[in-house]
Amino acid sequence: KKNNIRTVGIISVGLFGQPADMDSINRFAKDNNLWVVDDAAQSFGSTYKNRKVGSLCDVTSTSFFPAKPLGAYGDGGALFTNNEKIAEIAKSCRVHGQGKDKYSNVRIGMTARLDTIQAAILLSKLAIFDNELNLRQVVADQYTKNLNEIVKTPFVPSFINSSWAQYTIKLPKHINRDEFQNYLKSKNIPTAIYYPIPVHKQKPYKKFFITDEELKITNELSQSLISLPMHPYLNKKTIDFISNEVISFIKN
């Protein structure tokens, strides 16, 4: 409204393994006649109020990029919907806009088929996906046990089971994040920053005139969050080593 733009839909985004507050988003969308597409690239595998991500709105998209909870060895992704019409259109768009006949294109489409090798890898990984989610929870619990008195650790509401795409901590205000990251790098501990430049500061969105004051929490988090190593096969010894180095830097 502020920028005289007619909103037609909402793209909700799961982050670090947790879905967005989908009940509130769906309620708002229904009241305002909007569609909802959920970006579950980082939250695939998680649950929200005993419902699996992928079943929470009109359409859910996910990514099979290697860094995601269910990752292939290359690029890939999928859509989830209970709407037969949307599913039919998506299948058509995936293959050049194809209609019922192979050489009859009924809409503008693309080449977006998942290649056979990635599909085979995903089928094998899907068989162990639930177990890997449980292992990620064990890793997260150990990190939290080690670090909850020294940094701000992730908060997970009781009605959410996270897929722990990342384990992201908030550093104390007096800590220089670049120095912290360089210190861990010197100890052969990789880290990642998601995301140093918020969406409203990206060039394509500057035309919307969003002030820093309006999104001051976003700005603060973009400068203070950092993600520690996270995958299902981190053992306790490694987690404790990483945790001890985090504690050592912050205390000293």
Language-model-derived ranges and their functions:
Residues K1-A72, A78-F80:
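Active-site phosphate-binding strand-loop segment of PLP-dependent enzymes
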Residues K1-N3, G9-V13, Q18-S24, D31, ...:
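PLP-dependent aminotransferase class I/II
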Residues G74-D75, I117:
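A conserved catalytic-core signature of glycosyltransferases
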